[in-house]
Amino acid sequence: MTLTETSLSHNAEEGKDEGGRLQQYKNLTKHEELRRRRTECSVEIRKQKGADMMMKRRNIVDVDEGGNSESELEEPEKISHQQSSTRLSNDEIRAILSNNPSEDDMVRCFESLRKSLSKTKNPPIDEVIHCGLLQALVQALSVENERVQYEAAWALTNIVSGSTEQTIAAVEAGVTIPLIHLSVHQSAQISEQALWAVANIAGDSSQLRDYVIKCHGVEALMHLMEKVDQLGDSHVRTIAWAFSNMCRHKNPHAPLEVLRVLSKGLVKLVQHTDRQVRQDACWAVSYLTDGPDEQIELARESGVLPHVVAFFKEAENLVAPALRTLGNVATGNDSLTQAVIDLGSLDEILPLMEKTRSSSIVKECCWLVSNIIAGTQKQIQAVLDANLLPVLINVLKSGDHKCQFEASWALSNLAQGGTNRQVVAMLEDNVVPALCQALLQTNTDMLNNTLETLYTLMLTVQNGYPHKVDILHDQVEENGGLDSLERLQESQSEQIYTQAYRIITQFFTDDDAGEKESHENADPQDNKWSF
């Protein structure tokens, strides 16, 4: 059985266990809904990080000018102080390596191979694989010559930065274990380059990540963490990025005990002086918390979350993973949601939303707040006390459509879970114009949220605050809400039609009470004439 077949079989069993665990949640509906939306929301925020957090990275060098690589590896004079000018073809490399090559011959061959694989466009990865040079590269990793090892590790880094098929070909050729061994090499340059390749393998898929774990990749990472203070920034960036790839993939997640070990290393990385290290480490924490409660709990137990909240005051490339992390934590049980509040995160949201120009940051802020509002009434009150309700209403009214969508969820969660007093706070903060404007949207989920919020608000006012009924009705009519409700009765969506019909018949008919009750009890799809 191949590596791929074995891993896929194992993952299928893990998926069954994951489904079983979901049924153990105290509030299953809340968890399933929030986690579904967490998956949907993750795409936009990941666009923001762009190339900074690609699953794979190539070590590219200008092969025509012989410049330095992207990685800016340390101590280049110790290993790469010579640059051969002659480029060898794959056939020439095969011929030299097949004829009892000297170490100088090997250096020349693997340097040439590395240069060809470092081309910015269309590196010849398939050609190298098909001509049988993968095995030569694997063997080179064990040659007692640091220059040979380094050039081979660099070439392999770029091979495993390719497609899944190319990466699997390298793994099945046996690259993983020797690369992991070299990742703890005494030479920092070799160590970093080998770890870079290992991180590319782990970043490909959950199957290959699990294979790296099986080959003791986590132990190698934690060994490096023991001396992280002695390593250069470039090396630590590679370590942090490797952590993120080890935490990244789902279906299945990495084993809980592995994530527990990694979480301890992340505490140190998020406090590093280098911003790129902190950024990659925080993305790793966001992946760690993108799972069931026991996984989120690891982040809380490790002590990493207070450092994540502190990122709210830093540059937006740190704010983005911090918001994603805390939003993930808030999808957990009420205790985990409370942990987000206790960290003081709500106090940071308002100034963050006021100063940012990024719609992605605003959207993530709304998503985080909506997850907290989906908690207890005490937690809803914490959001109101932080003066975030007017901000949500303003986003619903004037934000871009993705931000409006998240704000509509937040207000819908408030309407469904808040006390009467908390629900009426929306009216006092002038929510009606924003709701009426949202009724003009075409997104079905957003319309459903808005109609549900408006209905609950009107019902709450009618039952508990009768002196505000006329004010509320007038505001709905003056802002075009009644016209929109009448139009939505023609919607192709049965749910939207039913909700619009319910609001009109219950709150905007002038018939006597008996006739009103008759309408309420009638099937909204029953259009028969009655006399």
UniProtKB/Swiss-Prot annotation:
InterPro entries: ARM-like (IPR011989), ARM-type_fold (IPR016024), Arm_3 (IPR032413), Armadillo (IPR000225), Importin-a_IBB (IPR002652), Importin-a_IBB_sf (IPR036975), Importin_alpha (IPR024931). The keyword Nucleus applies. Keywords: Cytoplasm, Meiosis, Nucleus, Protein transport, Repeat, Transport. Residues 5-67 form the IBB domain. Residues 11-20, 29-50, 515-531 have a biased composition (Basic and acidic residues). ARM repeats lie at residues 122-161, 164-203, 250-290, 293-331, 334-374, 377-416, 420-459. Transmembrane segments: none annotated. Germline tissues. Expressed exclusively in germ line cells from the early embryonic through adult stages. One of its GO terms (cellular component) is nucleoplasm. Residues 62-75 have a biased composition (Acidic residues). Residues 1-10 have a biased composition (Polar residues). One of its GO terms (biological process) is NLS-bearing protein import into nucleus. Residues 1-88, 511-531 are annotated as: Disordered. It is found in: Cytoplasm; Nucleus; Nucleus envelope. Disruption phenotype: Embryonic lethality associated with a terminal aneuploid phenotype: embryos display severe defects in nuclear envelope formation, accumulating nucleoporins and lamin in the cytoplasm. Worms lacking both akir-1 and ima-2 show reduced gonad size and aberrant diakinesis oocyte formation; defects are caused by impaired meiotic recombination. PROSITE patterns: ARM_REPEAT (PS50176), IBB (PS51214). Pfam families: Arm, Arm_3, IBB. GO terms for molecular function: nuclear import signal receptor activity; nuclear localization sequence binding. Forms a complex with an importin beta subunit. Interacts with akir-1. Nuclear transport receptor that mediates nuclear import of proteins, and which is involved in sister chromatid cohesion. Binds specifically and directly to substrates containing either a simple or bipartite nuclear localization signals (NLS) motif. Promotes docking of import substrates to the nuclear envelope. Together with akir-1 adapter, required for the import and load of cohesin complex proteins in meiotic nuclei. Belongs to the importin alpha family. This is Importin subunit alpha-2. The lineage of its organism: Eukaryota, Metazoa, Ecdysozoa, Nematoda, Chromadorea. The gene is ima-2.
